[in-house]
Structure formats: C-alpha cells, structure tokens
C-alpha cells in the first residue's frame, strides 16, 4: 500500500493539471492529506461509494497519462543517472564543489 501511495503521489505531482478540479480535490485529500473515504464524502456531501469510484477512475487516468507520456519514468531514469554520475565522479575524486553545484542544478531543473 505504501508503494502505491508513493506512486500515486508522484503521478499526481506530474499530471495534476490534466485532472478536473473534483479529481484533484479527492486525490489530494485521499493521498496527500490521508483522509478516509468517509471523511472526504462528508466534506463534499456525497456518498462514500462516489468518492471511491472517482478516486479509482482518477488512478486509472493517472496511469494512462504515465503510459502515454512517461514523465515519471523519465524523471526516475534521470535521477538514477545523476546519482550514478555523482558516485563515479566522487570515486575518482573529480567531484569538486563547482561540479557538485552543477549536478544539483541539473537535478532541480524539473
């Protein structure tokens, strides 16, 4: 469950602008704020089932966006490569402060 929550949070970070206001609200409450389905239903004055259905559809949408656009996958690949590069430079004692700063800037572009 923890892994799924982390994945949904990351997908939400990348694709939230593609969601409706209602989808953003429900997913934000559920995954980011850790509200229960009942608490969200009470907040929006709808049934628990309506919240559940909407969140499930939104999860499917987020996965479809990722399947087509691959933003999370590419981000994770870049992070892995940056970490490998940093480790290689450190191992060979090439990692001075200027190179370290440049790597950090590259990591933070997205």
Curated annotation (Swiss-Prot):
<dbReference type="InterPro" id="IPR036388">
    <property type="entry name" value="WH-like_DNA-bd_sf"/>
</dbReference>
<comment type="similarity">
    <text>Belongs to the UPF0122 family.</text>
</comment>
<protein>
    <recommendedName>
        <fullName>UPF0122 protein lin1916</fullName>
    </recommendedName>
</protein>
<dbReference type="InterPro" id="IPR013324">
    <property type="entry name" value="RNA_pol_sigma_r3/r4-like"/>
</dbReference>
<dbReference type="InterPro" id="IPR054831">
    <property type="entry name" value="UPF0122_fam_protein"/>
</dbReference>
<dbReference type="Pfam" id="PF04297">
    <property type="entry name" value="UPF0122"/>
</dbReference>
<comment type="function">
    <text>Might take part in the signal recognition particle (SRP) pathway. This is inferred from the conservation of its genetic proximity to ftsY/ffh. May be a regulatory protein.</text>
</comment>
<dbReference type="InterPro" id="IPR007394">
    <property type="entry name" value="UPF0122"/>
</dbReference>
